[in-house]
């Protein structure tokens, strides 16, 4: 099993991250098109304004295909805090320490930028 973690945008990652979230949460709690559309829209907006000094995006890939992600949206870090977003690992890589590695990278990124607050939102 070849799992790697890459930083930054990779072609196809917006669609793949949206798909992973949509399939998992559809099965788990019945979320539908509104959820998938929101994930895709907000992730696309984030990627379009991505600033490597302010924001972070890490992708876990299994044999070259995205199977996990985490992001730090630092746009409002000075006022509201850094926004931890799109933290997910697929069933194929869950439980192998990749989720901890992704979270560690995101938290290290925040520490290096002196982001004092980090928040996570949920969808209901």
For each of these PLM feature ranges, what is it?
Residues 3-92, 100-109, 113:
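Acetyl-CoA-dependent GNAT
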Residues 94, 119-124:
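Conserved beta-strand-loop-alpha-helix junction that forms the acyl-donor binding cleft
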Residues 97:
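Conserved G/P- and acidic residue-centered "switch" motifs that form tight phosphate/ATP-binding loops
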Residues 116:
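Short acidic/polar active-site loop segments enriched in Thr and Asp
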């Amino acid at each position: 099993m070849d799992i790697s973690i890459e930083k930054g945008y990779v072609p196809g990652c917006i669609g793949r991250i949206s798909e992973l979230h949509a399939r998992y949460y559809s099965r788990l709690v019945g979320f539908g098109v509104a959820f998938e559309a929101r994930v895709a829209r907000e992730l696309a907006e984030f990627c379009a304004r991505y600033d490597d000094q302010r924001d972070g995006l890490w992708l876990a890939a299994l044999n070259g295909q995205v199977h996990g992600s985490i992001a730090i949206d630092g746009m409002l870090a000075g006022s509201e805090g850094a926004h931890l977003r799109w933290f997910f690992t697929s069933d194929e890589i869950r439980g192998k320490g990749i989720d901890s590695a992704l979270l560690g990278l995101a938290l290290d990124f925040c520490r290096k930028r002196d982001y004092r607050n980090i928040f996570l939102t949920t969808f209901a």
